[in-house]
């Protein structure tokens, strides 16, 4: 092999990777945080993405920092994540509740709310199984409920839980 062949190969590989990323759909917090997803509208493209994303990453048990710009293939489509700090995967078994989630950590402000995490989850609560997604919002559930009303989203249709850190978990159940 000539000395220039490995260089040509690496250059070709780099161009192929850049082309793949250029063809990929960009997913950022602005794509995923909107009135539709905050209101648990399950027919939205974003809800479908969160469901597919969870399923794809669940197989790989992915946990990673520095995920921005990385290419992910989910159901034959390529995605590049931007604006997220990390992907985390966790499995919790506590008091007959089994919770498994894959979350995207971020610090994103929209609609006068600070979104800290977007996660897809599956939960088994004493035999009752649920699947969906949730947001962690920096603020108490009462304040989050007021902001939802201001946005025209009825809080009685949402599950707002207080986290151990005093924030709000806005939970949307897709199946269950």
PLM features: what roles do these ranges have?
Residues 80-150:
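Long, charged/polar, surface-exposed segments that mediate recognition or autoinhibition
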Residues 2-11:
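Bacterial N-terminal signal peptides that target proteins for export
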Residues 72-75, 82, 133-135, 166-175:
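Generic recognition of long tandem-repeat/solenoid scaffolds
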Residues 142-176:
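Glycine-rich, aromatic-bearing surface loops/beta-hairpins
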Residues 23-104:
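Short helix/turn-capping signatures at newly exposed starts of structured segments
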Residues 10-18:
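Bacterial N-terminal signal peptides
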């Amino acid at each position: 092999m000539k000395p220039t062949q490995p260089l040509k190969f690496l250059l070709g590989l780099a161009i192929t990777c850049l082309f793949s990323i250029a063809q990929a759909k960009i997913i950022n917090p602005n794509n995923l945080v909107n009135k539709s997803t905050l209101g648990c509208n399950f027919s939205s493209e974003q809800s479908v993405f969160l469901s597919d994303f969870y399923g794809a990453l669940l197989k790989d048990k992915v946990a990673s920092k520095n995920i921005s710009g990385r290419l992910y293939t989910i159901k034959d489509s390529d995605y590049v994540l931007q604006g997220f700090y990390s992907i985390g995967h966790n499995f919790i078994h506590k008091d007959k509740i089994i919770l498994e989630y894959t979350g995207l950590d971020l610090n994103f402000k929209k609609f006068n709310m600070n979104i800290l995490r977007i996660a897809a989850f599956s939960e088994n609560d004493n035999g009752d199984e649920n699947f969906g997604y949730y947001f962690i919002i920096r603020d108490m559930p009462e304040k989050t409920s007021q902001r939802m009303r201001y946005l025209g989203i009825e809080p009685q249709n949402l599950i707002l839980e207080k986290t151990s850190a005093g924030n709000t978990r806005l939970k949307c159940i897709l199946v269950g």
